[in-house]
């Protein structure tokens, strides 16, 4: 039995997500299994625009952007599991529960984003997510996202 990992490069990610610089927060998918889980990487660079104001003397990657990276990972998992979005569909970040920030994320860190599909009901999907740096959890949360036409 093979355990070959399924991956996605940045071109494949951009085919599925509408986000672009500076708001595309997933650099690469390192493994996923449809309707189960997705693991992705976000490389944190001092050259990102949020560091000019958050905070110039001690740059810290904003927690809300860690949550957004998790939400983008759930979008990738949903689209790979249940079909790519149509031209008039978006995948909205609907809610977050139990968000915990355990350690700051700083330039030079590589975040590994891990999301797990929990359930779907009436077009709203629930996920659990964690972000890790060097194997340590820096953030965890439960996320809900909704796929809707516009």
Curated annotation (Swiss-Prot):
InterPro entries linked? FabA_FabZ, FabZ, HotDog_dom_sf
Domain of life (superkingdom): Bacteria
In this protein, the active site sits at 54
Tell me where it mainly resides. cytoplasm
Compartment(s) of residence = Cytoplasm
Q: What class of enzyme is it?
A: lyase
Task: State whether keyword Transcription applies.
Answer: no
What are its E.C. numbers?
4.2.1.59
Q: Which CDD domains match?
A: FabZ
| UniProt keywords, alphabetically | Cytoplasm, Lipid A biosynthesis, Lipid biosynthesis, Lipid metabolism, Lyase
Q: Name one Pfam family in it.
A: FabA
What biological-process terms (Gene Ontology) are attached? fatty acid biosynthetic process; lipid A biosynthetic process
Q: Which GO terms describe its molecular function?
A: (3R)-hydroxyacyl-[acyl-carrier-protein] dehydratase activity
Q: Which GO terms describe its cellular component?
A: cytoplasm; membrane
What does the record give as the reaction this protein catalyses?
Answer: a (3R)-hydroxyacyl-[ACP] = a (2E)-enoyl-[ACP] + H2O
What family is this? Answer: Belongs to the thioester dehydratase family. FabZ subfamily.
Purpose: Involved in unsaturated fatty acids biosynthesis. Catalyzes the dehydration of short chain beta-hydroxyacyl-ACPs and long chain saturated and unsaturated beta-hydroxyacyl-ACPs.
UniProt-recorded name of the protein: 3-hydroxyacyl-[acyl-carrier-protein] dehydratase FabZ
Origin organism is Vibrio parahaemolyticus serotype O3:K6 (strain RIMD 2210633)
